[in-house]
């Protein structure tokens, strides 16, 4: 199962050339986390992927914390859009 990276970027970008903003990074990480979660449900003993999942969750958590501290409105919109707890 491949991630539609361009579609995710287009849905989260702030302007036409935006590919690295916090919103885009969190959106990409969220899709990767969902994909890894599905993979780990089928492959319970894949500890390397589990470690990668934890790293991605940790990075997303740091980025969301940064966004919440610097732009609360953008944080709330992103959490609502991605259906994340917040």
UniProtKB/Swiss-Prot annotation:
InterPro entries found in the cross-reference section: Ribosomal_uS15 (IPR000589), Ribosomal_uS15_bac-type (IPR005290), uS15_NS1_RNA-bd_sf (IPR009068)
PROSITE patterns the UniProt entry points to: RIBOSOMAL_S15
Domain of life where this protein originates: Bacteria
Keywords: Ribonucleoprotein, Ribosomal protein, RNA-binding, rRNA-binding
Cellular component per GO, a single term: cytosolic small ribosomal subunit
Any one GO MF annotation of this record: structural constituent of ribosome
Pfam families: Ribosomal_S15 (PF00312)
Quaternary structure and interacting proteins, as annotated: Part of the 30S ribosomal subunit. Forms a bridge to the 50S subunit in the 70S ribosome, contacting the 23S rRNA.
Function statement: One of the primary rRNA binding proteins, it binds directly to 16S rRNA where it helps nucleate assembly of the platform of the 30S subunit by binding and bridging several RNA helices of the 16S rRNA. Forms an intersubunit bridge (bridge B4) with the 23S rRNA of the 50S subunit in the ribosome.
Family to which the UniProt record says this protein belongs: Belongs to the universal ribosomal protein uS15 family.
Name used for this protein in its record: Small ribosomal subunit protein uS15
Gene name as annotated: rpsO
């Amino acid at each position: 199962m491949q991630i539609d990276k361009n579609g995710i970027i287009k849905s989260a970008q702030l302007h036409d050339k935006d590919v690295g903003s916090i919103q885009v990074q969190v959106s990409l990480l969220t899709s990767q986390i969902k994909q890894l979660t599905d993979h780990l449900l089928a492959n319970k003993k894949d500890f390397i992927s589990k470690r990668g999942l934890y790293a991605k969750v940790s990075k997303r958590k740091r980025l969301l914390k940064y966004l919440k501290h610097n732009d609360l409105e953008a944080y709330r919109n992103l959490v609502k859009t991605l259906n994340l707890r917040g």
